[in-house]
């Protein structure tokens, strides 16, 4: 389906949304539509490449002006949606943009749950540029955690404090941690404290946003995951009114050296407002396969039904948007 047609459908769905929310939503829908035929084919690079192509094509026709702060890599490594690439047809560069055309490429390639397409934006100069660091230690929860949890505290202390703040038994606290060797000791500590570990193997943006969303079934996200994904998450958490802290966590001597040369303070505890400041924040997450926040694509009668979560500080509350496009 032509981008203009998708854009018109989305405009009808979110007629009250100011620029550039609809354009960003059109971009994730385009990424999902463009890559859907490859989902489940076992080739994660093919799925991701198709999503990148479609998202970039959609954004190139957008009326706003933005710059990619969190993208697919450096210009010589990523020919499209690279860090520093200018987006849209606007006369001025008014927006920082973070893109992840497919978060969970392995999941999409396998056709298993949890793959999404994500884009986020904030006013120019407000989004932390951390592209030189791959990993970040993160703590994400709802507003109930504000003034209660601290990323420097032990997992046991945080789990017990959150149980008290939520007024529930610690055995009811559900903590998401990505299933990687670097987090195995943390996972063991969480379980020994009596909380429930929610396992996931890839795609920490959706799980982190779920942790900041009341009623999602996830109370807290802890552990080391992607640093760029942490900044994307922060945009959503700002809109949701949640709580988040992060510490950059390079894992190899080369990563540490690169981070230091780039001027990052590796001992700095980033509060939510350090990760993304400003007043206007937009976050869009569109389902590829079924996930914790949105359903995956449904194909029937030559049409794709695509579901998205839209968060915009200029709108009231989260919006669940569903559109149909030609398969």
Regions found by a protein language model. Give the residues of each.
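N-terminal subdomain of lithium-sensitive/metallo-dependent phosphomonoesterases centered on the IMPase/IPPase/PAP
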Residues: 4-98, 160, 164, 205-206, ...
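Oxyanion/phosphate-interacting regions
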Residues: 10-13, 20, 210-228, 232-327
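Solvent-exposed alpha-helices and their adjacent loops that cap or buttress functional pockets
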Residues: 60-61, 86-92, 100, 108-112, ...
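General beta-strand structural signal in soluble alpha/beta enzymes
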Residues: 68-72, 97-99, 108-110, 129-130, ...
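Short acidic, glycine/serine/threonine-rich loops at helix termini
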Residues: 80-82, 110-112, 131-133, 185-191, ...
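DPxDG-like acidic metal-binding loop motif
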Residues: 92-103, 107-128
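Acidic beta-strand-loop-alpha-helix segment within the catalytic core
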Residues: 118, 123-200, 262, 279, ...
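A contiguous, surface-oriented mixed alpha/beta subdomain in the mid-to-C-terminal portion of proteins
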Residues: 180-183, 191-223, 227-231
